[in-house]
């Protein structure tokens, strides 16, 4: 099921407050720290041997920003998220061989990070809308695996 009109409104109304670099760095850092086996996809990033190394790694920050910027672009295509991510899904499945469960894991890390940055503004309703969006994105990115 797609996102509701109300969910889309909540997301578009709040996304403009996002600092893609800060959010991306923290969310990807959380993923790499919490799920250390995901580090195998980022061997070119240098030292990821500790939480401190991860959270101070410029390659992590740059890639996190890239991913969060992509989410921002997907928000502009909420009516066709699968279409928007079709090529990226294929790339992640056929070239990078990323475990598709990691897309869902990243969505969880991103949701936690948004909660941290939004504070009280991250209401249960807004949280649920973002979770629905991140599930749709994870599903779209996993499409290349089906």
Curated annotation (Swiss-Prot):
Keywords: Heme, Iron, Metal-binding, Oxygen transport, Transport. One of its GO terms (cellular component) is hemoglobin complex. Signal peptide: none annotated. The keyword Phosphoprotein does not apply. GO terms for biological process: hydrogen peroxide catabolic process. Residues 2-146 form the Globin domain. InterPro entries: Globin (IPR000971), Globin-like_sf (IPR009050), Globin/Proto (IPR012292), Hemoglobin_b (IPR002337), Hemoglobin_oxygen_transport (IPR050056). GO terms for molecular function: haptoglobin binding; heme binding; metal ion binding; organic acid binding; oxygen binding; oxygen carrier activity; peroxidase activity. Heme b binds at residues 63, 92. SUPFAM superfamilies: Globin-like (SSF46458). Red blood cells. Gene3D superfamilies: Globins (1.10.490.10). Heterotetramer of two alpha chains and two beta chains. PANTHER family: HEMOGLOBIN FAMILY MEMBER, HEMOGLOBIN SUBUNIT BETA-1. Belongs to the globin family. Involved in oxygen transport from the lung to the various peripheral tissues. This is Hemoglobin subunit beta-2. It comes from Xenopus borealis.
């Amino acid at each position: 099921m797609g996102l509701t009109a109300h969910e889309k409104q909540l997301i578009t109304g709040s996304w403009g407050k996002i600092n893609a670099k800060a959010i991306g760095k923290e969310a990807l850092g959380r993923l790499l720290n919490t799920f250390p086996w995901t580090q195998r996809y980022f061997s070119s990033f240098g030292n990821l041997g500790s939480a401190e190394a991860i959270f101070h790694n410029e390659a992590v920050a740059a890639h996190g920003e890239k991913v969060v910027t992509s989410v921002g672009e997907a928000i502009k295509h909420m009516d066709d998220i699968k279409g928007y991510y079709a090529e990226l899904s294929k790339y992640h499945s056929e070239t990078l061989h990323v475990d598709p469960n990691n897309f869902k894991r990243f969505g969880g890390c991103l949701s936690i990070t948004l909660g941290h940055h939004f504070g009280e503004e991250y209401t249960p309703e807004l949280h649920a809308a973002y979770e629905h969006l991140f599930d749709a994105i994870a599903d779209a990115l996993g499409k290349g695996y089906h």
